[in-house]
Structure formats: C-alpha cells, structure tokens
Amino acid sequence: MVGVDVGREYVRAAVADLTGKIVAQRRQAARARSARTLITTIGSVARAAAESAGIGWRRVTVAAVGSPGVFGSAGHPLLAHNLPGWTREGVLDEIRRELATSVVFENDVNLAALGERWRGLGREVDDFVYFHVGTGVGLGIVIGGELFKGANGAAGEVAYLPLATADPHDKANRRRGALETAIGADGVLSAARHTGVRGATTAAEVFEAARGGDGKARHAVALVAEGIALGIAAIVPVLDPALVILGGGIGRNADLLREPLERELRALSPFRPRIEVSSLGEEAELMGAVSLALDAAQDRLFSRLDAGRGVAV
C-alpha cells in the first residue's frame, strides 16, 4: 500500500508492506498553480515510490492520500485555501482516476495524529491532540485511541477559533480563520513587523534571528507562543487531553516557544496537560497516511477471507 502526503510545497509518498514496514519513499517539490498539475504530481510521486520499492503499480491495493481540507460528505475537500483549486467539484474523483486503485482520503493534520498514535508519542496515550502550527493551523484529535472527526469531518479545525489578536469578523480572517491568521506563518511575520524585526521574509527567518539573539525577533516569537497558548487554553477544557503534541514548521521550535507558551498557559488556565514536540517531525503526516492505508488494506484482506468462509460482512 502507499501513503501520500500532499502539501503546498511538496508531495511525499511512502510504500509499505502488510506488516507496516516502510520499503520506499519519494518526495518532489510541488509548487503547483492548479489542481490538475498537483494531481499529476501525486500520481508520478506515488508511482516512483512503488518503482523504487521494486513493485509494479498494479500490486498497490490501497493508497491513502492526505492534504489540507475537511473531508466530509461533500465529495470534495472544504476549507483547503492553501492548495490551488483543491475545493472544486470532482477533485477526489480525479485523484482516484490518476491513481487507478482504491483510494482513501484524510485531512493532513488528522493523519499526523494517526502517525503519532502508530509510531510516535501517542503510542501509549489514548487521549491526546496533535496541534499543527505551520503555514496553516489545525488539530488532530485522538479519543479512546481512535481518531475523532465529528459529524462532518471538521473536528479540529481550530484555525477558525475566534481567538488571539486577529479580528474574527474581518472577511479575510473568516476565510482562513482568526487563530491561523494570528499564529500561522503569516502571523509570525505580522508579529515580526509589529516588534520591528527587519529583513525577515519567512517565519523560519524570524525564528533563526530569535535563535541568534535578536531581541525583537524573540519578542515576536513570544507573541506567537502566547497565541498558541491561547489556542491550547481553549482546547483543553473541552477535550481534556493527557498530551498535547506540537507539530508543524512553527510548532516544532520548542526551544524558543516553550517558556513563553507555558508561562502564558499558566496565566490563562488551571489545566496543565503535558506538552511535547512531535517525535516524528515532518514525517508525522506521511506515517499517518501509511497507517491509514495499512488499516484499509487489512480490512479489505480480512473481509475477503471472511467472505470466502461464508461469513456475512
């Protein structure tokens, strides 16, 4: 089976056998300007991974594809503003035709939570959340050892919490979410401008400057950390997780975020969940995709075995 992680800047694929052993991986830049181009890249990267594993594509029984967006009953992703054309009708059917195998879809942050449950910090924890803070913001929720998606697949879309410094009534913020506007990649740059940081054009450069001792950059990072703490303070009383796993390109900067984040959380909330940085790093989503594909493949296999024994399935 194949797991595929689709991001704004890359497409990654991993091939695994039925034991879950990863036998090949491939990655390709994907600065696509259209959904059609991105779908073609998904197909080429997935097939390249299978070829690297030494198997023909016809032997791939299931592909799990993860990307930003809500995968509910609409037949196409919703709220996937970071990928061009991704919310239009027919996108999922086009991916199925491109891959020409059984395909399951899931939100990328949900996949990261599954990855942590399978091979990361969530292996021994039944109730935890994966808080992704990067270009976008989202939450993967595991309750009782199972992924929780809600009635319409939108559980964890915390980007739309009307929190932090962004005005939730602003039309631009309603499109991408007030919390994402405040603490996502653009929020880091906004905080940097507010504190007087000069020359930084990416969130990574702001963190690099802070790590190098730039006081204004450290102030900007502290503002972002306080916004993350506000998000956690809103989440914890509702879900009561034993563990909050921070992930994403911003969330993984624990050396800079932890002290102001925990200080602000102490000021905001009486609840003290354990907070850790993802042990899987940027591999979390891909491992989750493989885990989802593995579950789907095993379900198909056992259904066929039961059907062969005359068991109703």
PLM features per residue range, with description:
Residues 4, 18, 59-177, 293-313:
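Phosphate-binding/catalytic loop of phosphoryl-transfer enzymes
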Residues 1-59, 99-101, 119, 165-313:
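ATP-binding/phosphotransfer module of carbohydrate and carboxylate kinases, centering on a glycine-rich
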